[in-house]
């Protein structure tokens, strides 16, 4: 069996003559003249050579992006014959196909069994071939699946000896690109439209390119082609284009098109000489527009963020200095001026929710029925318990105080339509002003004497907890700042911090770094760098007051808080805990994220998808350290939220392979439910830690998901992850083959093996490697030492 390898050749082969100078004593040629002539020729030759290299590289890139090979027993000759079909069409056609999101499969699997064709409808299976015939699907050797993105499946054959079959392949390729050229969403090319009209007047041309059904429709419509006729007969227009495409590019059929449909031949000739390139460029431009990230920038972004402008200006200096992206969750805009005035912000020791209505808006009411959870019995009960718990457990640090509103705050709430200042009333000789809101349960008033706000239940109304009461002070949660209890409002929640890798490297002691980088063994060096980045950049530890953070994240929080205090803020800290990246218990999904980039620019994304795309384009796609919340794409253990997040690199759900901790947790869960260990007759409670295979798998999974791999170059930075994934796969294979494994675990390990296969294949594809995962696995020898095996692995990947 030949080695399963797809080797792209040149798109076109240009013959070059090398000038040979035969200089003899009888030739009267000046040396300088000869040198001048040689230099000019050499420049031209080198220019052509470079151009040829560029064409070859472009063709190779087009192939790598498009073609997937699937075969087990075909010869390299047949693969080459199949590949040669693509060499006969311009690279721009392949680029059009690529821009449409298309894929091409070379396979020796029968089309009826191919995975990409299992969801075809009967109508799709009976689509026309190039002769306008509906043939049995089982007899197809090439098929174009038309959905949102085209997929072309081609059986590996010796197409060089069968011109009809090669023409059929070109017809199906033509169908793929016709999805864009002739689309219901686009205006038909006027030149092509006029061409169809002229072809309908020529019997030879129409007989060659139109189906009988289409010719009859044209006759019934008096050969009048308007927008409605095009929409009703889109498939027929696409068929005519695809058929002309096949005649033009199938070498043995080109003269037929030139003889019987010369106008169409000329049209195809124009496309080949520049038309396809224009279409490709147009699609690329559309792709840029489609991928454009819709954001607010500058002052608009800042205003929409809710951050105090002076604080944001202080933060951007830090972002510049530390070459770090600082991402914030949106701040309650009713809290912005409170923070600016010196109101304290809540940390992790207060779990009550803030309010977004009535006079308490922006604060955290002790009575949670005044919060944004108003009217929700369970949430109010839980919030009230949380507030009481905070005061009890953090006595002296957390308390409650009466709510006071000054004139400026009342005016701000009035401007936002939250309250209205109503009529004056006298109660026990004291003057109050009613504060009107849209609430149906409570009435509010403010004391003219001390600005304290009170509330009571309206006549005939009861609270969600079944209470009814007269005027009482509204109390809000407060924090002790330098001996004074200050009311609390929402803090600045960090969504993420993404420092440059050079900043993380500064955290590593120079002696430790030098010891690792001077290691001669490349794999050991990469492992060493990875371990240093884990230790100093990624390793995070729980903190009782700030949540889960790494050392550099703690330093960043200190820098941010000091910068705010320098602006004159007197409320203590404004950033009180770690990022949303580590909020795995109670994750939250925000439509808007405020970003300060390392250039000090303000940016606000407008939806969750745009946030992901921004991170992909500007952070994970460059040399910045970033990791995702591991609770995404699963039910969070705390608030039971399900938040979907797609990995910008692999385009896959990020939890497709478990982490080391999740792997052990899954095994423990099976053990608890079955009361059986991984291995038969195992009564050892600590077997997970002692069994070598389980330890190895856990270690490989830990290395696989290590964000520190981003320290390496773009070309190599995913290689370690791929290699670790393959190592985990191999160890799982060993476990499954073992006769000692308990049957209760077999399904889990099989499932895990499939997950690894799928995700590693995605990484291979992103690496632009043409090799299939299982084929790569077979070429590695796991009985060799790890370093030698890794070198073999790198060589295979680089060749592909």
Curated annotation (Swiss-Prot):
Mutagenesis or variant effect for residue 329 to M: Great decrease in activity
Catalytic CB: annotated span: 350-489
Signal sequence coordinates: 1-33
Domain ATLF-like residues, every copy: 60-273
Region (Catalytic CA2): 490-622
Catalysed transformations (reactions): ATP = 3',5'-cyclic AMP + diphosphate
Catalytic site: 351 (proton acceptor)
Listed result of changing residue 529 to A: Little effect on activation by calmodulin
Annotated region described as Interaction with calmodulin, given as residue ranges: 623-800
Primary localization class, coarse: secreted
GO biological process terms on file: cAMP biosynthetic process; symbiont-mediated cAMP intoxication of host cell; symbiont-mediated perturbation of host signal transduction pathway
Effect of residue 583 to A: Decreases activity
Name under which the protein is recorded: Calmodulin-sensitive adenylate cyclase
Species, as recorded: Bacillus anthracis
């Amino acid at each position: 069996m030949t080695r399963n390898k797809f080797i792209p050749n040149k798109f076109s082969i240009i013959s070059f003559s090398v000038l040979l100078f035969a200089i003899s004593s009888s030739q009267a040629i000046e040396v300088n003249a000869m040198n001048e002539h040689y230099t000019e020729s050499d420049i031209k030759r080198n220019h052509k050579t470079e151009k040829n290299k560029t064409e070859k590289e472009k063709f190779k890139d087009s192939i790598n992006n498009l073609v997937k090979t699937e075969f087990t027993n075909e010869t390299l000759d047949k693969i080459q014959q199949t590949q040669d079909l693509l060499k006969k069409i311009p690279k721009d056609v392949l680029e059009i196909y690529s821009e449409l999101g298309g894929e091409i499969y070379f396979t020796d699997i029968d089309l009826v069994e191919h995975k990409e064709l299992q969801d075809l409808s009967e109508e799709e299976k009976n689509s026309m071939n190039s002769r306008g015939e509906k043939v049995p699907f089982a007899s197809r050797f090439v098929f174009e699946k038309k959905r949102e993105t085209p997929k072309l499946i081609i059986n590996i054959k010796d197409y060089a000896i069968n011109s009809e079959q090669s023409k059929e392949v070109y017809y199906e390729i033509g169908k793929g690109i016709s999805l864009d050229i002739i689309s219901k969403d686009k205006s038909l090319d006027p030149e092509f439209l006029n061409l169809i009209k002229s072809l309908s007047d020529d019997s030879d041309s129409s007989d060659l390119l139109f189906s009988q059904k289409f010719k009859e429709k044209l006759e019934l419509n008096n050969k009048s082609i308007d927008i409605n006729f095009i929409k009703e007969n889109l498939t027929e227009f696409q068929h005519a284009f695809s058929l002309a495409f096949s005649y033009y590019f199938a070498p043995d059929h080109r003269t037929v098109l030139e003889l019987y449909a010369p106008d169409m031949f000329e049209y195809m000739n124009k496309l080949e000489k520049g038309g396809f390139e224009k279409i490709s460029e147009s699609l690329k431009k559309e792709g840029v527009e489609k991928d454009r990230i819709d954001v607010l920038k500058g002052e608009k972004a800042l205003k929409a963020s809710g951050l105090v402008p002076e604080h944001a200006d202080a933060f951007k200096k830090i972002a510049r200095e530390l070459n770090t992206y600082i991402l914030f969750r949106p701040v309650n805009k009713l809290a912005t001026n409170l923070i600016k005035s010196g109101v304290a912000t809540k940390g992790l020791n207060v779990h009550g929710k803030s309010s977004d209505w009535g006079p308490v808006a922006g604060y955290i009411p002790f009575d949670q029925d005044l919060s944004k959870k108003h009217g929700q019995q369970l949430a109010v009960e839980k919030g009230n318990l949380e507030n009481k718990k905070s005061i009890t457990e953090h006595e002296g640090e957390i308390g409650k105080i009466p709510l006071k509103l000054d004139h400026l705050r009342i005016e701000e709430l009035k401007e936002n339509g939250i309250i209205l200042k109503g009529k004056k009333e006298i109660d026990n000789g004291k003057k109050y002003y009613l504060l009107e809101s849209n609430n149906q349960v409570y009435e509010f008033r403010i004391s003219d004497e001390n600005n304290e706000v009170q509330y009571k239940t309206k006549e005939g109304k009861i609270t969600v907890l079944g209470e009814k009461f007269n005027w009482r002070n509204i109390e809000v949660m407060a924090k002790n700042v330098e001996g004074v209890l200050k009311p609390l409002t929402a803090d600045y929640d960090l969504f993420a911090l993404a420092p440059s890798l050079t900043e993380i490297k500064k955290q590593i002691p120079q002696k430790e770094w030098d010891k690792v980088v001077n290691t001669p063994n490349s794999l050991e060096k990469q492992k060493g760098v990875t371990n240093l980045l884990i230790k100093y950049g990624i390793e995070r530890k729980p903190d009782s007051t700030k949540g889960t953070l790494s050392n550099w994240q703690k330093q960043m929080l200190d820098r941010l808080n000091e910068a705010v205090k320098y602006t004159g803020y007197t409320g203590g800290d404004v950033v009180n805990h770690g990022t949303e990246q580590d909020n795995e218990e109670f994750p939250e999904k925000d439509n808007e994220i405020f970003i300060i980039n390392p250039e000090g620019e303000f940016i606000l994304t407008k939806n969750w998808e745009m946030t992901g795309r921004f991170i992909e384009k500007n952070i994970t796609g460059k040399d910045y350290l970033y990791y995702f919340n591991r609770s995404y794409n699963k039910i969070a253990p705390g608030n039971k939220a399900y938040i979907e997040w797609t990995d910008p690199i692999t385009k896959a759900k990020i939890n497709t392979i478990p982490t080391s901790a999740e792997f052990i947790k899954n095994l423990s869960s099976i053990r608890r439910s079955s009361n059986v260990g991984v291995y038969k007759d195992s009564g050892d409670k600590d077997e997970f830690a002692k069994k070598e295979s389980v330890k190895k798998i856990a270690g490989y999974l830990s290395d696989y998901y290590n964000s520190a791999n981003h320290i390496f170059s773009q070309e190599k930075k995913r290689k370690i992850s791929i290699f670790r994934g393959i190592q985990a796969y191999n160890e799982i294979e060993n476990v499954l083959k073992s006769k000692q494994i308990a049957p209760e675990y077999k399904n889990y390990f099989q499932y895990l093996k499939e997950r690894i296969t799928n995700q590693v294949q995605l990484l291979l594809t992103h690496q632009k490697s043409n090799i299939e995962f299982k084929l790569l696995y077979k070429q590695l020898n796991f009985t060799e030492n790890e370093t030698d095996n890794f070198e073999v692995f790198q060589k295979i990947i680089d060749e592909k």
